[in-house]
UniProtKB/Swiss-Prot annotation:
Chain residues in the propeptide: 24-49
Transmembrane segments: none
Protein name: Conotoxin Cap15a
The record's account of how the chain is modified after translation: Contains 4 disulfide bonds.
Taxonomic lineage: Eukaryota, Metazoa, Spiralia, Lophotrochozoa, Mollusca
Domain notes: The cysteine framework is XV (C-C-CC-C-C-C-C).
Keyword Nucleotidyltransferase: no
């Protein structure tokens, strides 16, 4: 009987931890679309302008011409990004 009580207690703790970890992950995923929507709205409000060509500095992927992304290269502590394929 004591073993059964102990197993139920352990199962409850593990289930609680699983639910807490899953809910934290869900909040992180829900936040991402808002970030992308904000960037997209910002780009729309700036209006039509020329895109940044490959190899030139950028702050956001929206600045780069089509088929290019704003990427940081070099060391993990990279401070400048460039439009790259």
């Amino acid at each position: 009987m004591e073993k059964l009580t102990f197993l139920i207690l352990v199962a409850t703790v593990l289930l609680t931890i699983h639910v807490l970890v899953q809910s934290v992950g869900d909040k992180h995923l829900k936040r991402r679309p808002k970030q992308y929507a904000t960037k997209h709205l910002s780009a729309l409000m700036r209006g039509h302008r020329q895109c940044t060509q490959q190899g030139y500095g950028c702050d956001e992927t929206e600045e780069c011409c089509s088929n290019l992304s704003c990427k940081c290269s070099g060391s993990p502590l990279c401070t400048s990004s460039y439009c790259r394929p």
